[in-house]
Amino acid sequence: MDNNNEMNLSEATEALCTAESVVESMDEMIKLFGVFDENLKVISAETGARIIAAGDCIRIEGSAEAAELAKTVVDKLLITVRRGENVDRSRIRYAVDLAKEGNADLITELESDVVAFTAKGRRIKCKTLGQKKYVNALKRNTVVFGVG
């Protein structure tokens, strides 16, 4: 019976994968991780990977699939942080959903298109693919009906 336990432990160890992302500054890490590492906890929970800050690196551990998913999400969210955008729970969950569907590139594409500016100069951007499709339809067509 001890041999079975040893084999299970070694199989589990072999299945563990690691990935790393490099952070340019501590400010980026703080903005990405959020208050009391709340964002980090959401990314971990949504991807199933363990995320550890080590100096200027973010080390990601988990199964090959979980580690790759978490790395993709972290890298895309770092681009968001570098653009000066805020990262919150809903944005993280949406980014994870897009990455799971294989549409990780759309995470940064959504944020690049400014729809309008407020009176105070803040940018209004699409937050979901549905909003982006709607705005593109408004730009292309004379009449657009929105339901819902």
Residue ranges and their predicted role:
Residues 2-3:
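Extended, non-globular interaction scaffolds
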Residues 6-17, 111-113:
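Flexible hinge/switch segments at interdomain interfaces of large molecular machines
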Residues 11-31:
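Short glycine-/aliphatic-rich beta-strand segments at the starts of folded cytosolic domains
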Residues 28-45:
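Short amphipathic alpha-helix segments
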Residues 45-47, 54:
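N-terminal assembly/transducer modules of large multi-domain enzymes
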Residues 52-111:
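Interdomain "pre-motor" coupling segment immediately N-terminal to P-loop NTPase/helicase cores
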Residues 102-147:
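Pre-Walker A segment
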